[in-house]
A protein has these predicted regions:
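Periplasmic/extracellular, small/polar-rich flexible segments of pilin-like filament-forming proteins
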Residues: 57-142
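Aliphatic-rich helix starts adjacent to a transmembrane/signal segment
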Residues: 31-48
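Conserved catalytic core of two-component sensor histidine kinases
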Residues: 18, 45, 52
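N-terminal single-pass transmembrane signal-anchor helix
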Residues: 2-36
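Alpha-helical segments that scaffold the active site and NAD(P)H-binding pocket
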Residues: 25, 53-54
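Non-catalytic effector/regulatory segments
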Residues: 3, 33-34, 51, 93-98
Length: 142
């Protein structure tokens, strides 16, 4: 007498595998999201270093730092474009759309502060770079 043996998986086994894959996918998406956020913040900090180097060159040429105004500024696309402008700004290529940050520079010509504001997520992440400190400082919303 011959038995009919059908090999395969039960519905319960398939459901367990699908549930495990779902949990692993969720963890991966969360980890990837925080990775891209930290990458954007690092890129913004690097851009601020690039702006600072351009400021050093500008100071060597004109005996003052380039600023957009003396009062605290709010970084927008317009203020970022002023920094990029070769005639009116520092003339450095900033890929602000790729890193999702806007920049502005304020000060009195003998000192300057660079501000960066996130253009993604909650849009409250702000990074500040001062001539005195020479490092980028993030607020608590980053």
């Amino acid at each position: 007498m011959r038995k009919n043996l059908i090999a395969g998986f039960t519905l319960i086994e398939l459901l367990v595998v699908v549930a495990i894959l779902g949990v692993l996918s969720a963890v991966g998406i969360i980890a990837f999201g925080s990775y891209t956020t930290s990458t954007k913040m690092s890129a913004a900090s690097n851009t601020m270093q690039q702006i600072s180097l351009a400021q050093t060159e500008h100071f060597a040429d004109s005996d003052s730092y380039w600023v957009d105004g003396t009062s605290v500024c709010t970084p927008t696309e317009a203020t970022t474009k002023k920094i990029i402008d070769e005639d009116k700004g520092l003339g450095i290529p900033i890929s602000y759309k790729d890193i999702s940050f806007y920049f502005c520079i304020y000060g009195d010509g003998t000192d300057y502060t660079i501000k960066a504001l996130a253009d993604y997520g909650s849009k409250d992440c702000e990074i500040t770079f001062t001539l005195a400190d020479q490092k980028a400082v993030r607020n608590d919303k980053c």
